A protein has these predicted regions:
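Short pre-catalytic strand/loop immediately N-terminal to key active-site residues, enriched for Gly-Thr
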Residues: 17-29, 170-172
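Active-site catalytic microenvironments for nucleophilic, acid-base chemistry
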Residues: 6, 10, 44-52, 69
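Conserved hydrophobic residues forming the short capping helix/wall of the S-adenosyl-L-methionine
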Residues: 4-8, 46, 160-163, 167
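Glycine-rich beta-strand-to-loop/alpha-helix junction loops that act as flexible
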Residues: 33-34, 174-179
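ATP-dependent small-molecule kinase catalytic core of the GHMP/sugar-kinase superfamily
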Residues: 51-171, 184
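DPxDG-like acidic metal-binding loop motif
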Residues: 29-60, 76
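N-terminal beta-alpha supersecondary unit
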Residues: 1-17, 26, 119
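Short, active-site-adjacent cap segments at secondary-structure transitions
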Residues: 26-27, 112, 179-182
Length: 185
């Protein structure tokens, strides 16, 4: 709904819609489900708008303007490419992953509110140590939200400890603001 309202605000388009959304990504899992839904809605609205009004075209850069206002990681969801995210997920750089990997997602069925995780985050105490960094294809994998997420859901630490012991794992960590963890093989 926020995507639709923001799109209308930008374009002045008052066309009526009924939007049905089937959710398959768990809420509060740190997998960007809500952000992906918002991005998909923006992409659809742009397509419909541009088909209806051939004279006034909404550009991709217009979508990025809206996406940045709606949420820091929504712009990344407008892409369908390998990306390196930093900052709050709002600094996006295309990144080629040279190897083929297999991914394991472990979701402990804990709904972690992004706001609660950020409220438990302290910029002052945030220090990256080498033991917290994981290298993959010359990329450093590091998630600043891991410590506050573990504070709220200690099970995350158990999952990561288990993942670390799996043979042939090349990287592991927590996705987004948690609670889903991943292993890369």
């Amino acid at each position: 709904l926020e995507s639709l309202n923001a799109f209308r605000h930008l374009t002045g388009w008052d066309k009526k819609f009924q939007i049905n959304l089937d959710k398959y990504i768990p809420i509060g899992a740190g997998l960007g489900g809500g952000s992906a839904d918002a991005a998909a809605t923006l992409i659809l609205l742009r397509k419909l708008f541009n088909e209806e009004r051939k004279s006034k075209v909404v550009s991709i850069s217009n979508l990025y303007e809206i996406a940045y206002r709606l949420g820091s990681d929504i712009p990344a969801c407008l892409e369908s490419k390998d990306l390196k995210l930093s900052g709050y997920g709002n600094k996006i750089k295309r990144q080629r992953i040279s190897n083929c990997y297999y991914y394991l997602l472990v979701n402990p069925r804990i709904n972690l509110s992004t706001n609660k995780v950020f409220n438990n985050f302290s910029f002052l105490s945030e220090q990256k140590s080498d033991k917290d960094k994981i290298l993959l294809d010359n990329l450093t994998i590091y998630n600043s939200l891991l410590k506050p997420a573990i504070h709220l859901a200690p099970q995350i630490n158990s999952i990561l400890s288990t993942l670390k012991t799996i043979p042939n794992i090349v990287a592991y960590g927590m996705s987004g603001s948690g609670s889903t963890c991943f292993g890369i093989f």
